[in-house]
UniProtKB/Swiss-Prot annotation:
Transmembrane segments: none annotated. Ni(2+) binds at residues 48, 123. This is Uncharacterized protein YraH. Belongs to the glyoxalase I family. InterPro entries: Glyas_Bleomycin-R_OHBP_Dase (IPR029068), Glyas_Fos-R_dOase_dom (IPR004360), Glyoxalase_1_CS (IPR018146), MMCE/EMCE_epimerase (IPR051785), VOC (IPR037523). Keywords: Lyase, Metal-binding, Nickel. Residues 2-127 form the VOC domain. It comes from the Bacteria. It holds the Pfam family Glyoxalase. GO terms for molecular function: lactoylglutathione lyase activity; metal ion binding.
Length: 128
């Protein structure tokens, strides 16, 4: 078994597409506005966006609540050349970061964290 891609189920499809395309600069390889589906192919790892409503219909969960957020359930990690520069670029684009770049000695890495429009946690990461 091999992981193919990660599908994020989003509340505001248009806003999420703009965030991943414009703020993060990920290239879109497939976009279906009517179905509210987008595929970003960033090399080895692909990220899909699909509206939560559409996915709920597909799996028969349309009557279940979309509310009830808790602590983060997962994290998307992006390897970058320079955490501080990437942080500054994101900040200039209006991305609200959770923390400033800092070293995690136990990971031998420099990291910073922010969230997408659906509050999914994202980490930028560089080995020390």
């Amino acid at each position: 078994m091999k992981l193919l891609q990660i599908r994020l189920l989003v509340n505001d499809f248009k806003k999420s597409v703009e965030f991943y395309k414009d703020s993060l600069g990920l290239p879109i390889s497939w976009l279906e506005n009517e179905m509210e589906y987008a595929l970003f192919d960033n090399g080895e790892t692909k990220i899909e966006l699909l509206s939560r409503e559409t996915m709920a219909e597909i799996v028969g969960e349309e009557k279940k609540s979309l509310e009830g957020e808790a602590q983060s359930k997962f994290l998307l990690q992006f390897k970058v050349e320079d955490v501080d520069k990437t942080y500054d670029d994101l900040h200039e684009k209006g991305v609200k970061c959770e923390n400033k770049p800092h070293d995690r000695k136990e990971w031998s890495a420099r990291v910073a964290h922010f969230r997408d429009p659906d509050h999914n946690l994202i980490e930028i990461y560089k080995m020390l």
